[in-house]
Amino acid sequence: MSKNAIGIDLGTTYSCVGVFMHGKVEIIANDQGNRTTPSYVAFTDTERLIGDAAKNQVAMNPHNTVFDANRLIGRKFDDGSVQSDMKHWPFKVVNAGGGKPKVQVEYKGETKTFTPEEISSMVLVKMKETAEAFLGHAVKDAVITVPAYFNDSQRQATKDSGAIAGLNVLRIINEPTAAAIAYGLDKKGHGERNVLIFDLGGGTFDVSILTIEDGIFEVKSTAGDTHLGEDFDNRMVNHFVAEFKRNDKKDLASNPRALRRLRTACERAKRTLSSSSQASIEIDSLFEGIDFYTNITRARFEELCADLFRSTMDPVEKALRDAKMDKAQVHDIVLVGGSTRIPKVQKLLSDFFSGKELNKSINPDEAVAYGAAVQAAILSGDKSEAVQDLLLLDVAPLSLGIETAGGVMTALIKRNTTIPTKTSETFTTYSDNQPGVLIQVYEGERALTKDNNLLGKFELSGIPPAPRGVPQIEVTFDIDANGILNVSAQDKSTGKQNKITITNDKGRLSKDEIERMVQEAEKYKADDEAQKDRIAAKNALESYAFNMKQTIEDEKLKDKISEEDKKKIQEKCDETVRWLDGNQTAEKDEFEHRQKELESVCNPIITKLYQSAGGMPGGMPGGMPGGAPGAGSTGGGPTIEEVD
């Protein structure tokens, strides 16, 4: 089997990575020791930060810290949800050519724009590196999860993100399906169970109903809303902005930094309210020197979000209808996603199922990555007993079809059809001697195509002249296991064929663009490495200078060193520290050059000192300069990366 394939849960707010090894899944902690990593990327004057480091500095740098890429990916700039999200985002989203949204930031003093795919790929690189650090070797293959309700263009764009991150994406799978694997993996031999996965995450909401029996996971239906979750935070933020306006007559909305600090406090309060009945918010000097101290009760929060909480039941009903199941037939209700910790959501769900106990046996933050890791192991040929005979049968979330006369949507593949699947239908011409047909492919549930989403179109030309209704054109829809569609059309009389992989020509990145982005990603990575080395060199010089000052002050050595030598070292060290204070952003070789200079003054004196003292008293403080963490590698001691 290939070296470990990993499973990545690429979430809207947090991401998580797992790997299947030695017969079980390991969820891997990042360099900060956290098992989930914020899906944040930040750009500063000197560096690019990803994950915790990016989220930690967001209040100081709100305009250049990008998050929620999942809400942009595979969407058009004019999309209603993109427009409404932009009101809440402190970073700038611009309309790049072809109606694609791009994020605009300042990086190292220049204005840069990035596609949502590139931002997501940076988060994926972080997850990939987290796994590599744990496994001790490079990782190539991955399974990446997406919300079940993602449409074709969103799936394709996620796959492209993987390619930009240098990953070979074995498969794109749906989050609730992945969570079901995490839930059902150890439940073999329990007979057939109908399981409802209720997945309420940081930005999306999915409900899937599966039947699990003897390692076969068959999705019966899926429903959802690609927009929910973070809206809970927005409600609380808006509530406090209004309170601040009432009490202090000031409008917070005009200040991104204040809003960001408030949002961070609201996120924390929301979590607190899942376990206590009230939370306090204390923010010093929030706006124009005014401190903001306030409380919010659980009841108040529930009232602010009442309609949102209630709306989570609609997809549950829809999924049951589509699965042709009654409430009573559901054996297990499994909670996934951080927002399912909200007591009100749990109560509504339990009441909907007539007071049924909810299943909390899996970790809601890690279940999706867990399932993805299992699927990655299966696809890369793992032979271990735990994943033997596991079969995943997923479904297409939306109906797919073509436009026929009068703008009617004719569905070839109905929603919730098990994938992979292939189906053909024969169509004909609308007018006499029509030389060609335009095949327009749509996804959605509405009767008219204008209300559905156009995926792409192509022309089948060269049809021999014939009266209307005579030519026979066979249209074939073929969905692969990633949920990505191929469409072909063939004129039966001539055998002439034309086909298109619906990769959403308008919105999709071309091969060349992906190539270019891969190279840029490499370049950014090299920049990040250089920045790390630069800081290591700076820290090395600083610690060397301070160590020297300490050495000459050492009680044991004080009298062994002449005043003149002492003064020489003292002055050179002070000069170095002064230079450091004024040149924090100098280049690596400047720091190294300064260190050599300082060593040339100190080393002869220190050597003389130790020769006269007869051997080294317990090793020289800080080690010789080579041992300081500047010599290209990170030294022995802990170096602290986070530099604000």
Swiss-Prot record:
Task: Specify the superkingdom.
Answer: Eukaryota
Please note every region of biased composition (Gly residues): 615-638
Annotated GO molecular function terms are: ATP binding; ATP-dependent protein folding chaperone
* One Pfam assignment: HSP70
Q: Which CDD domains match?
A: ASKHA_NBD_HSP70_HSPA1
Name one process (GO BP) from the record: response to heat
Q: Looking at the keywords, is ATP-binding present?
A: yes
Quote the Gene3D superfamilies the UniProt record gives.
1.20.1270.10, 3.30.30.30, 3.30.420.40, Actin, Chain A, domain 4 (3.90.640.10), Substrate Binding Domain Of DNAk, Chain A, domain 1 (2.60.34.10)
**Alphabetic keyword roster:** ATP-binding, Nucleotide-binding, Stress response
Task: From the UniProt entry, list the residue stretches annotated as the region Disordered.
Answer: 613-644
Family the UniProt entry places it in:
Belongs to the heat shock protein 70 family.
Instruction: From the Swiss-Prot or TrEMBL record, give the protein name.
Output: Heat shock 70 kDa protein
Query: What is the organism field in this record?
Result: Brugia malayi
Give the organism's phylogenetic lineage.
Eukaryota, Metazoa, Ecdysozoa, Nematoda, Chromadorea
The gene it comes from is HSP70
